[in-house]
């Protein structure tokens, strides 16, 4: 008997997962237009020609707002399954969710007091 008798489907899955992107990339390379017009090399931004250079420094406040957004977006990802299964999980899961929310509220208050949420 073959040693890997239960893994043929897994091997086939990995082969298909490797071939599909390779075939898609090859097909797009074969079917794309070959000529390049000078307009194709220009920067396109919302239908308007950009003014100034592309290498400008952004304010660090954008980073802070994005970081706070990601934290609370991840919170939503964790709390949604908990809310769906709330009735089946019991009291311990409720207390764990309260601790999780409390930690995030403490982090939000800390960021607020440090001025991370103020623009000026």
Curated annotation (Swiss-Prot):
EC number of this enzyme: 7.1.1.-
InterPro entries according to UniProt: NAD(P)H_OxRDtase_bac/plastid (IPR023043), NADH_UbQ/plastoQ_OxRdtase_su3 (IPR000440), NDAH_ubi_oxred_su3_sf (IPR038430)
Keyword presence, Cytoplasm: no
GO MF, any single term: quinone binding
Compartments, record wording: Cellular thylakoid membrane
Swiss-Prot/TrEMBL catalytic activity: a plastoquinone + NADH + (n+1) H(+)(in) = a plastoquinol + NAD(+) + n H(+)(out); a plastoquinone + NADPH + (n+1) H(+)(in) = a plastoquinol + NADP(+) + n H(+)(out)
Transmembrane helix keyword on record: yes
Cellular compartments per GO CC: NADH dehydrogenase complex; plasma membrane-derived thylakoid membrane
Transmembrane segments: 1-21, 64-84, 89-109
Coiled-coil annotated residue ranges, if any: none
Main localization of the protein described in the UniProt heading: membrane
Membrane topology: Multi-pass membrane protein
Record keywords, A-Z: Membrane, NAD, NADP, Plastoquinone, Quinone, Thylakoid, Translocase, Transmembrane, Transmembrane helix, Transport
GO BP annotation list: photosynthesis, light reaction
Protein family according to the UniProt entry: Belongs to the complex I subunit 3 family.
Assembly and interaction partners: NDH-1 can be composed of about 15 different subunits; different subcomplexes with different compositions have been identified which probably have different functions.
Functional summary from the UniProt entry: NDH-1 shuttles electrons from an unknown electron donor, via FMN and iron-sulfur (Fe-S) centers, to quinones in the respiratory and/or the photosynthetic chain. The immediate electron acceptor for the enzyme in this species is believed to be plastoquinone. Couples the redox reaction to proton translocation, and thus conserves the redox energy in a proton gradient. Cyanobacterial NDH-1 also plays a role in inorganic carbon-concentration.
Protein name per the record: NAD(P)H-quinone oxidoreductase subunit 3
Organism: Nostoc punctiforme (strain ATCC 29133 / PCC 73102)
